[in-house]
Design a protein with these regions (language model features):
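DNA polymerase processivity clamps
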Residues: 1-201
């Protein structure tokens, strides 16, 4: 069993925020990162991510990051205060392996209960014909994890896909489960029909 980290790896939060940034959904749910004692989760309404953080963290909060994570941040802590407010403290690890706090910023707490994403995350995915996806979601693995390899596995009902990352990426990002919703099967026919109407007009 891995030794737990004293703080949350900032790269995991950056990854969750990268998913949220691909978003045109106004709901608060699609603007927050959910963190509990085991996982970091986020959704933009059409795709979702769950990662193990392996940190000493015993809260269960869904918070909106008002400002982006500083480039030099290596780790972070979520702080809850007596007045109900929440802040994030960023750390960098110095040569003596001490964690040095260097910046703090506000967070916005989601008041509603964060939904249980487990039913979506525990679907069965297998090799097969990949359903049609919104093109920008094909870029998610690169936007979130950088260079690596990925397999796209459809769910049994072909309504979603799992982006199965390579072993190194999986180790670095807490065994990420990244799922995106598929589009309707006849979307290409609709697109062709719209194109024909435009060309005739």
């Amino acid at each position: 069993m891995k030794t737990k980290l004293p703080h949350i790896d900032a790269d995991l939060i950056r990854t969750a925020l990268a998913l949220i940034s691909v978003n045109d959904d106004p709901r608060m749910l699609t603007k927050v990162v959910h963190i509990n004692n085991q996982y970091i989760e986020a959704t933009n309404g059409h795709a979702l991510i769950r990662m193990k953080h392996n940190a000493e963290f015993d809260q269960d909060v869904a918070v909106q990051f008002v400002y982006s994570v500083p480039d030099e941040a290596e780790f972070l802590d979520i702080n809850s205060h007596d007045d109900g407010s929440h802040t994030v403290t960023y750390y960098r690890q110095d040569r003596d392996e001490e964690f040095r706090p260097f910046e703090k910023s506000e967070l916005v707490l989601m008041q509603e209960h964060y939904p249980d994403l487990t039913p979506l995350l525990t679907k069965t995915f297998k090799e097969g014909k990949t359903p049609i996806l919104v093109s920008r979601y094909l870029a998610l693995p690169y936007l979130m994890f950088g260079i690596g390899s990925v397999d796209v596995l459809p769910s049994e009902d072909s309504r979603s896909v799992l982006f199965a990352m390579d072993a190194l990426t999986s180790e670095m990002y807490g065994e990420p489960i990244l799922i995106a919703m598929a589009m309707e099967k006849d979307i290409h026919k609709l697109s062709q029909s719209l194109r024909d109407q435009i060309m005739v007009g």
